[in-house]
From Swiss-Prot:
Gene name linked to the record: y12C
Name of the molecule in the record: Uncharacterized 6.6 kDa protein in Gp54-alt intergenic region
Length: 61
Protein backbone atom coordinates (compact mmCIF):
# COMPACT_ATOMS: atom_id res chain seq x y z
CA UNK A 1 0.00 0.00 0.00
CA UNK A 2 2.94 2.32 0.66
CA UNK A 3 4.01 2.15 -2.99
CA UNK A 4 0.54 3.01 -4.26
CA UNK A 5 0.28 5.92 -1.82
CA UNK A 6 3.73 7.11 -2.89
CA UNK A 7 2.78 6.84 -6.57
CA UNK A 8 -0.36 8.94 -6.16
CA UNK A 9 1.07 11.41 -3.57
CA UNK A 10 -0.74 10.36 -0.40
CA UNK A 11 -0.96 13.95 0.88
CA UNK A 12 -3.03 15.33 -2.00
CA UNK A 13 -4.68 12.11 -3.25
CA UNK A 14 -5.04 9.61 -0.38
CA UNK A 15 -5.35 5.94 -1.34
CA UNK A 16 -7.71 3.57 0.51
CA UNK A 17 -7.70 -0.20 0.10
CA UNK A 18 -11.26 -1.46 -0.38
CA UNK A 19 -10.44 -5.07 0.52
CA UNK A 20 -7.86 -5.06 3.33
CA UNK A 21 -7.85 -8.89 3.64
CA UNK A 22 -5.45 -9.27 0.70
CA UNK A 23 -1.67 -9.15 1.26
CA UNK A 24 -1.30 -7.24 -2.02
CA UNK A 25 -3.89 -4.47 -2.43
CA UNK A 26 -6.19 -5.60 -5.27
CA UNK A 27 -9.03 -3.10 -5.15
CA UNK A 28 -8.43 0.46 -4.03
CA UNK A 29 -9.85 3.95 -4.27
CA UNK A 30 -8.11 7.28 -4.73
CA UNK A 31 -9.67 10.40 -3.23
CA UNK A 32 -9.99 12.74 -6.20
CA UNK A 33 -10.91 16.16 -4.91
CA UNK A 34 -13.99 16.90 -2.82
CA UNK A 35 -16.24 14.32 -4.52
CA UNK A 36 -18.25 12.03 -2.26
CA UNK A 37 -18.00 9.11 -4.71
CA UNK A 38 -14.51 7.64 -4.89
CA UNK A 39 -13.36 6.01 -8.11
CA UNK A 40 -12.46 2.34 -7.58
CA UNK A 41 -9.57 0.58 -9.29
CA UNK A 42 -8.55 -3.06 -9.46
CA UNK A 43 -5.19 -4.64 -10.17
CA UNK A 44 -5.53 -7.89 -12.08
CA UNK A 45 -4.06 -9.91 -14.89
CA UNK A 46 -6.05 -10.40 -18.07
CA UNK A 47 -5.85 -13.54 -20.15
CA UNK A 48 -6.22 -12.78 -23.84
CA UNK A 49 -9.15 -14.43 -25.52
CA UNK A 50 -11.18 -14.76 -22.34
CA UNK A 51 -13.09 -12.82 -19.76
CA UNK A 52 -11.09 -14.04 -16.77
CA UNK A 53 -9.47 -11.50 -14.49
CA UNK A 54 -7.03 -13.16 -12.12
CA UNK A 55 -6.02 -11.80 -8.74
CA UNK A 56 -2.41 -10.68 -8.53
CA UNK A 57 0.02 -12.60 -6.39
CA UNK A 58 3.65 -12.09 -5.42
CA UNK A 59 4.93 -14.37 -8.21
CA UNK A 60 3.59 -12.02 -10.93
CA UNK A 61 6.07 -9.30 -11.80
Amino acid sequence: MELITELFDGASAPVVTLNPKHKIPQIFAIQAGEESVLPGFRFCTYTSGGDTNKTLNQAIK
